[in-house]
Amino acid sequence: ALVHPPPPTLVPPTAPAPPAPPEVAVIPPPIVAPLPPAPPPLPTQPEGHRDSVVWLAVAPDGHSIMSASTDHTIKLWDIAAKQLIRTLGVHKDMARTALFMPDGVSALTAGDDGEIVQRKLSDGAVLHVFSSGGNGGVRKLAISPDGKHAISGHDRGNVIVWDLKKGAVLHAMSGNGWSVSAVAVAPDGRQALSGSIDGTLKLWDIESGKQLRSWHGHERGTYGAAFTADGHHLVTGSGDYTIKLWDLDSGREARRFEGHEGTVYALALSADGQRLVSGSLDGTARLWDMDTGNQIAMFDSRTGPIYAVAFTADGTVLTGGNDRTIRDWPAAGGDSIVLFAGAPE
């Protein structure tokens, strides 16, 4: 008999070992910085402004503030009592400027309705209305230190010199066709400056109405202007985010103040001429050293554009803006106090 050998035992091939997993770096989750806390709700007061505060002026005696707003109203406030004295008047369109007359008993206010109105501070009674006629709205207004003349800048490009005693136009100076967005009067009352939304600056002789100089001062519009006490220098703020100090004797830029990240809309000089405050659409006001051009402090409203700035008699910085409030700020920077709140929305 044939003997068959047993079938061979099949050994399955050894499966290759799985490859080792690649080393994977463990990336920790990103650290997300917490959002800054939201600003506290704004206080309100029924008699406050109902829209942006676009102008502030401090009375010569330092006791009161006058404000102009796009809600058409002019309001007079008591600083010490922290309350409204009265709504001084209402324009037919946005109010733009409100200035105390040197006599201490009246004010001059102006707005987009084209009217310049002299009002009694004691009760708001209208003493005189200066109508700009076909010149359009009054964007900015300035008064000579002796109270004899007012200079108005208009949205149709003209600059008008008013004889306040006679209640009449002394000169109507033709600009360059662009809306006039800044005006200022020299301390001696003999010269005036106008700035336009194209960045052009013009120096005028008030008595004759003649143009003394014209130059392109900024790459964008000029929205704030102030003469220094010596009358030989001028500061201007602009939509190009800069502030410039001009030497009027040479016509050259003497210094530049930089730091804002939006249009510089308002300027004011301290009584001693050592400090400059600027308000900007970037939501900040900044305090500057006039001698060095260095920034001393920054005030951040966190509530939108700042349209108006002023110094009180003791040097406190005041601002007004998009949030309808009037605020005062510590000189070294930091948080503000709402001096006068806006009306409830």
What is the meaning of each model-derived region?
Residues P21-E345:
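WD40-repeat beta-propeller superdomains and closely related acidic/aromatic-rich repeat-like regions
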Residues A1-V32:
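Intrinsically disordered, low-complexity, repeat-rich polar/charged segments
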